[in-house]
Amino acid sequence: MGFSLHAFSDIPIPQWMALLRHPDVIRHMPLADPNWDEDAVAEWVQAKDAQWVDNGHGPLAIRVDGHFAGWGGFQREDGEADFALVLFPAYWGQGGRIVRHFMSRRAELGLEAVNILLPPSRLRTRGLSRLGFQRVGEVMLDGQRFLKFRSPG
């Protein structure tokens, strides 16, 4: 299975809505609003694309074998690089190679240490150590607890 990366705006809004409203996806995104409407999703897409201009890096939409699979990439969170990956459940087995691809690009993007924040509902985290991440603690965001993992630069 091959994957390709795209601007968020390359993906039709209804496909984004399907991802952002998917119950299995929402279960692992405690800050998500399952009631997205088209206008809110369009604004969100525009803001994600704007991160490339604002930060020199940002998230990208992911297609696997030409099909929209989700999104991933580096975002700014409290002045640090935070990696996020959100995939439709059918593509959850592709996460490792997608993370490895993004991590291989961090030097060209000027990124050193990278964090991953996961909700405690994510029980399977051992794979992160194989990708160079170590658990370094917990953080609270908008009243929700997240496990913090870091990969040094």
Task: Map each language-model feature to its residues.
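A short, well-structured alpha-helix characteristic of acyl/acetyltransferase catalytic modules
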Residues: 1-42, 46
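Residue-level recognition of conserved beta-strand positions in structured domain cores
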Residues: 7, 85-87, 118, 151
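Acetyl-CoA-dependent GNAT
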Residues: 35-84, 88-90
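Active-site beta-strand termini and strand-to-loop segments that position acidic
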Residues: 63-65, 150-153
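Conserved acetyl-CoA-binding loop-helix of GNAT-fold acetyltransferases
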Residues: 92-106, 130
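Conserved active-site alpha-helix within GNAT-family acetyltransferase domains
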Residues: 100-101, 120-137
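Conserved catalytic-core motifs of GNAT/GCN5-like acyltransferases
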Residues: 117, 134-148
